[in-house]
C-alpha cells in the first residue's frame, strides 16, 4: 500500500505540499531503470516535490501490477509519497474527449477493474477529471427515457460512483481514500453528470482543477481569476479541509508567466496541495521557451526569467524546463503564504446544479472585486451578490426579501432580474430588463438628485458597450451609475430600498468581456458598492485583481502586459503599507480630490479610509500588510 508517513522525506515547502501526476504511459516508461533514473534526476534538479500520483488507467491502457510496484518502490526509496490515479477516459476521436459509456457492459467492467487495481496498490487514489458522462449511445438513449440528459446523467453517475468505483475499491482495500478531481468548467457540470451536491459528498475528498491557461486563445476562454475562485468555491462545497488541492498543467499558454500565475493564484486561495500535470512534461529534456513576453521582459516582474534560468536546487547547469518554472514559482510564494490569513470576499451564492451568466464571477474578479462563491445562501453576509445562476433556487425571491428585511444588501445582475420577472421580484422592486439594447460610451455617476458627474476617463474615448435597457420608475429606484448614448440613458447600477435593506441591480453587458472596457472610474464606483464592508478596495484598470485575507493582509495582482498604477483604500487610520516580498514601505497619500469617482458617485464613505498608491509591474503581484 501507500508509504507510511514516517518514511517520507522532509516537506518540500513550508505552506503546502507539491505533487506530480504521472499518467499511465509515463508510468509504463518508468519501468525502465535508466529512464526512471534520468527523468527523476531531470525533475529533482529543478523542482522539489512531496508526492506522485501513479496512474493505473487511461484511454483503454492499464498499468500492470509489477510495474506499479516497481515504480512505487522507487519513489518510496527516495522518500516521496505515492498515491494512485485513474483517468476514466475512452480513446479520443477527432480531438474530442470521450468518456466511458456507463450503459455498456465492457466499459462498466473497465471502470470497476481500474478502481480495484488502484486500490490494490495504494491507500490514496485520485480520479482525474474524466469521470463525467458524454456518450449518447442507443443504450444511453433507451436508459434515459423521458428524463433530461442532465437528470439522467446525474442519477447514473451517483450510481456509478457507488457501485463501480467506491464499493469495489473499498472491498479490495478497506483503508483506501478516494478523491474526485473536478475540472474547471463548473458552470456546466450537471449536464455531464458531475454533481457537487451529492456525488462530491460520496467521495472521501475532492480536488480542484485550477488550470485556466490562456484567457483569449483557448476554446474555453477562462479568465485568470478562476484559478483562485474555483478553489474557493469547491472549498465551500466541501469545507474543513476536504478540498485537498489544486491542479495545474503546462498547456495552452502564450508566455511562461501565465503558467506561474495559475500556480500562484491556486495557492493564494490557500490550497494545501498543488498537483503538477504531468511528469512527462516536467521530465522532458527540452528547454522551456519564454514565449511572447517581450513587452515586459526587461522589467522587474514577479516571474523573473533571468533569475529563474540562473536558479536551480542542484545547479546542474542544464537548461531550465517546465520543472524549473514550477519550482521557481512555488518557491516564490512559499516565502509569504504563511503570513496570510483566511481568504475573504464578496459573498456570492451559486446553487447546486445551476448555470446562468456563465463564469461571470471571474470577470468581476479580474475587475478587482474579490469574490467568495458558495453553494449555500450566505444569510449572515452584509451584502450578497446574485447572478443569473441563482434563478435555479425556487426560494430565491423569498431569500432576497428576508435578507433585505434584515437590514442587509443584495446585488442582483440584469440577467437574474430578467430571469425572475413574473416570478415575484416585482414584490421587491418594479424593475424590468427589456429586450432593447443601448450602445454606451459615456458614463455618469450620481447619488441622489442632481446632474451627476462624468465618469469618463480624461483623454480616452471609451468604446461602445452594449447594455440591456433596464426600465425603472423615477423616485422609486435611483440610478447610481448610468450610461448615456445620444440623450438616452441606461442604468449601469440602480438602487431600490426595501424594508431596512437596499437592492442593487448591476447591469451586465451582452458580452461580459466588455466589463474590461468600462472606464476606470466606472469600475471603481462599482467596486465601492459591491465590496460593502470589506476593508480594502482598489482603484485600478481592468485585469488587476484583489485578494483579501482576514488578518489585514492582501494581494494586488496584475494580469496586464503593461505596468499598472493602483490606488488602494484601507479602512481605518494607517501610516504605512508594507510589502511582504520586498520589505518596501509605502506611505499614505492624501485622499483623492472631490472629482474622484469613488467619492462622488456613491454615498458618503462609512468610517475612515487611508489611501495608498502602488505600482504593479506586468503579470506580477504585490503582497501587503497595513502598519
PLM feature segments, named:
Residues 8-381, 385, 393-396, 404-405, ...:
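Glycan-processing catalytic domains of CAZymes
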Residues 388-627:
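A conserved amphipathic helix/loop scaffold
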